[in-house]
Amino acid sequence: MGTPDFAVASLKRLVEDGHEICGVFTQPDRPKNRGHKLAFSPVKEYALSQGLSVYQPTKMRDGTALALVRELHPELIVVAAYGRILPEDILNTPPYGSINVHSSLLPKYRGAAPINWAILNGERETGVTIMYMAKELDAGDILHVMKTDIDPQEDAQALTARLAELGAQALSETVEQLRAGTAHRTVQDHSAYTYAPMLTKDMGVIDWTKTAGHIHNQVRGLIPWPCASTELGGATVKVFRTEVLGETGKAPGTVAAAGKAGIDVACGDGHLLRILELQPQGGRRMAAADYLRGHPLQVEA
């Protein structure tokens, strides 16, 4: 059970490992782009390419989905970014239970956006957790954990791709352990949990009175959506790549330099943040130096 690109890696690994996939559950087709043409989820596209049976129930709690799951007789349910809450009746159907591929080091960052919040909070390390699913969100017993460092320049989109592959590897190892009877479950430390709520569009607006490090993490953590944004010379731009520089005596929000190296803006902690890549409204993503050719900025002396 899964929907976005993140889940494709896990499904692909199960197929490559030779497991029988009795059914693939994914969210219903959604309108996409301006034409509002219905589009398949990435999981559905991959499943159909492999000749797998795809199911897209609109509700999981009305009894129809439960009847369908029971009809399929799964030995194990695997969930990866499905985007739906599963009732206990479904979770308890398979003899081996239901497990989830979660993109954080539980109990930290339970919830919908763990990858984004790890970067927003400036974490240096993250990973994936394979856990049993329980009634409470992301609170089930842990079966397997794999860790990885977060590069200071890595954004959420790039980290998601890496964790998808790491999650697929962890899932493969976990399923083999379950099959062999060697899996060990560890109860989460519920007193240590943190929550990673859904992102909102207003989170993208840059407040230059914040520290340069905070804004740098905001830029990285909100890619590809909603993206950090700010006004430069009266025009709103999305900011995609930055780096923290040295100290300045200029007021927060002041453009201290603008040239081939990028656009340097003063932040609330007295440091500069250099904008390296941005996207103007209605335009493409580009280097800040290219943007300046058509949009010169006034630099405060």
What are these regions (language model features)?
Residues 1-35:
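N-terminal Rossmann-like dinucleotide-binding module
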Residues 17, 27, 76-195:
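Donor/substrate-binding cores of folate-linked one-carbon enzymes
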Residues 27, 31-75:
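N-terminal glycine-/serine-/threonine-rich beta1-alpha1-beta2 phosphate-ribose binding loop
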Residues 3-6, 58-61, 82-84, 245:
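Short beta->alpha connector loops
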Residues 20, 51-53, 97:
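Conserved beta-strand segments of alpha/beta enzyme cores
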Residues 197-210:
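Acyl-group handling in specialized metabolite and lipid biosynthesis
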Residues 209-301:
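An anion-binding loop in the catalytic cleft
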